[in-house]
Amino acid sequence: MTVAEELPETPETADEEPVKQRKNGLYPGVSDELAENMKSGWADTELHDLEPIAQAAETAARRAALSARFPGERLVIPAGNLKTRSNDTEYPFRASVEYAYLTGNQTEDGVLVMEPTTDGHQETIYLLPRSDRENGEFWLDGQGELWVGRRHSLTEAEKRYGIPASDVRELAGALREATGPVRVVRGYDAGIEEALTDKVTAELDEELRVFLSEMRLVKDDFEIGELQKAVDSTVRGFEDVVKVLDKAEATSERYIEGTFFLRARVEGNDVGYGSICAAGPHACTLHWVRNDGPVRSGDLLLLDAGVETHTYYTADVTRTLPVDGRYTELQKKIYDAVYDAQEAGIAAVKPGAKYRDFHDAAQRVLAERLVEWGLVEGPVERVLELGLQRRWTLHGTGHMLGMDVHDCAAARTETYVDGTLEPGMVLTVEPGLYFQADDLTVPEEYRGIGVRIEDDILVTEDGNKNLSSALPRRSDEVEAWMAGLKG
């Protein structure tokens, strides 16, 4: 990895914002002749045939809904900034969901500002414009275009996103001087928040965050299409993993993680969350993302993974697979119990149902099996009332899905967990049973077995649709599917 050099101060650059400098470059400095040479000889690369983003109509409608909810108030929605990984390297950037949802843009340091007018709001997207060739920023700044790639010009950005664009470097000063009521989405851009520190309140800002979260509870057609794309790529990623299980046995869970990641990067933007590639007793650790354990024949592999599309929509799918292609009798018994619980949960997903219904339906089946197996004393109603099944079921049976894997997290309880399902909602149904390796309350043969089955379910007008139905779920179908992929 190369290192950017330091821009010398000249009369032309002395009053400008300093270029970000990186230390310890091999060149001691920049001669006046080189600095002058780098100013010219560059072709005009302005893009004139840009088309609007595919979701331009949807993002405009979302901004209109936001405007209607907060008339007369200035609204500030930042994308966020790069975060340092180490020294002068950064983590890959992912824009705030609120910003991406309203604009379609994914650029660091971007800010959407909606200025109140007599009939709504005037929208402006603030971005960093093209690198300036005159002051050397494009080649001497570590974030200049020569180092990290070409940016859109402001004119190009307007064409792509359908929003007037301005230079973000002018925004903080303008916000400091602004008057009138204002709300900001917090937690993404400290500089913007500092500029508004005496103009905003936590209570009003939280109302904005909650509203933006609840807007995403019901997905539009574009979002549903993106979620289906994410799921379809995820299915192919699971197929990839099955084909390399023999190689994973020779290495570790990391091989599985890397195999799925390749599919996510080839067909999408990234993985939607840290892949859980949990073999053997690691399947009993709900968020096992270290993925550094062995993969052994005879064990189960719990793979919980999802591809994220280029528009940030993610799948979230789990299958629990026999490493050698066939479940043992006990593994099958536990797996089939989880399958039956998931079937009951999915059947409860329909418009007008309470959000909690699918969780309750799945938990009842699991409690029945635990009583049947003699692992907990019945009757089932007592087990459910006291929550005794939770020693082995551990987690809720699902969550909303969208641009965040756990989507709409800021929504109010009454609209989410205590709410009612509506057509267009997308959620996961993911019951599980987990018998910890050190659980002395169950027979030894159960210990270290963990099973989860998870699918992405769309609420439709007359019921539901399993977006991930292309991946087999029944134990016999899983075995046949694996055999076909392994040849």
Sequence positions of predicted segments:
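Active-site neighborhoods and metal-handling regions in enzymes and metal-associated proteins
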Residues: 1-487
